[in-house]
């Protein structure tokens, strides 16, 4: 009798352990929209300071995504989850921004940064210029184009005199610098040039070469003959301006990145697909890449 009891207990234990093993092999993580919302809030928060490519916050997010892929058992496409490359990135040089109008009689008018003018982030080949009516100045209804020996510069009206907009950064853009101005500044520049004044401007940004990375993770499929399914989302955005305004980019593109991260987490639990699924978190989309 005792032997039978031991036998049945052992059999029961084996069945339970086998059931748990099978259950663990076939459990899956359903796609959770609440996780996506939470992730969007985190990625677009001040913690990541706008995720500008080349910034330390952007690098922190690279590592967060890499760890996420690794924790969910995705494998690198090559030897590393990160595919590194170099870009030219704007950096705040902490100089004092100014737009000054200097007249022949010695009078000088200083316009207010963030109220009368502000950089448009699209390019910073030059961030300090001086010009007058002796330079080539083309006037249009909503912008002023200035050509000097240092290059071409554009002063354009901010939509509705609102400086909250920030462009993507394009290093090979044809203008050396673009500056947002309001209607009063537009008129002051034109009137002062007619009066023979000299205009000087400094924008508190410069450029540096930075190494950044895309982050790639793969769910391996069972077939080597089928082409892979490639899913991408860019995780960078526009960073922080000199007034400490943070461009969080919840829709562009914390939302897409968060969706992709939740999707890979879910799909990684469904067992092997037929084809490889490659997840690519792209960097420097806001630099035109």
Which sequence ranges carry the predicted segments?
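N-terminal hydrophobic or amphipathic helices/low-complexity stretches enriched
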Residues: 4-76, 165, 219-221
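Second-shell loop/turn segments in exported
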Residues: 26-30, 46-57, 71, 75, ...
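Extracytoplasmic/secreted envelope proteins and their assembly/folding machinery
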Residues: 33-40, 62, 66, 186-187, ...
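Acidic/His- and Gly-rich active-site-bordering loop/insert found
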Residues: 43, 69, 87-95, 100-104, ...
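Active-site-proximal beta-strand/loop segments in catalytic clefts of secreted hydrolases
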Residues: 46, 131-134, 156-160, 182-183, ...
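Noncatalytic luminal/extracellular "stalk/propeptide" segments of secretory-pathway proteins
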Residues: 49-144
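Soluble metallo-hydrolase cores and metallopeptidase-like ectodomains found primarily
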Residues: 167-249, 269-270, 274
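Acidic/histidine-rich catalytic neighborhood of metal-dependent amide-processing enzymes
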Residues: 211-214, 244-289
């Amino acid at each position: 009798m005792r032997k039978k009891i031991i036998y049945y207990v052992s059999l029961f234990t084996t069945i339970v352990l086998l059931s748990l093993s099978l259950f663990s092999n076939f459990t899956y993580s359903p796609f959770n929209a609440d996780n996506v919302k939470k992730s969007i809030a985190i990625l677009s928060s001040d913690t990541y300071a706008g995720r500008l490519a080349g910034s330390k916050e952007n690098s922190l997010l690279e590592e967060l995504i890499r760890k996420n892929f690794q924790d969910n058992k995705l494998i690198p496409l090559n030897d590393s989850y990160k595919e590194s490359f170099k870009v030219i990135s704007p950096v705040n040089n902490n100089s004092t921004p100014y737009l000054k109008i200097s007249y022949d009689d010695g009078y000088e008018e200083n316009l207010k940064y963030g109220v009368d003018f502000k950089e448009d982030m699209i390019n910073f080949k030059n961030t300090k210029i001086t010009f007058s009516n002796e330079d080539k100045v083309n006037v249009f209804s909503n912008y002023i184009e200035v050509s000097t020996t240092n290059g071409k510069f554009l002063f354009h009206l901010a939509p509705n005199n609102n400086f909250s907009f920030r462009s993507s950064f394009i290093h090979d853009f044809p203008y050396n610098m673009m500056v947002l101005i309001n209607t009063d500044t537009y008129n002051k520049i034109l009137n002062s040039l007619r009066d023979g004044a000299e205009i000087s401007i400094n924008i508190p940004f410069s450029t540096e070469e930075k190494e950044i990375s895309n982050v790639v993770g793969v769910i391996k499929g069972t077939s080597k003959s089928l082409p892979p399914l490639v899913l991408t989302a860019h995780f960078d955005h526009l960073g922080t301006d000199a007034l400490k305004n943070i461009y969080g980019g919840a829709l562009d593109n914390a939302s897409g990145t968060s969706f992709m991260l939740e999707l890979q987490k879910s799909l990684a639990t469904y067992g092997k697909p037929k084809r490889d699924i490659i997840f690519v978190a792209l960097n420097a989309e806001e630099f035109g890449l």
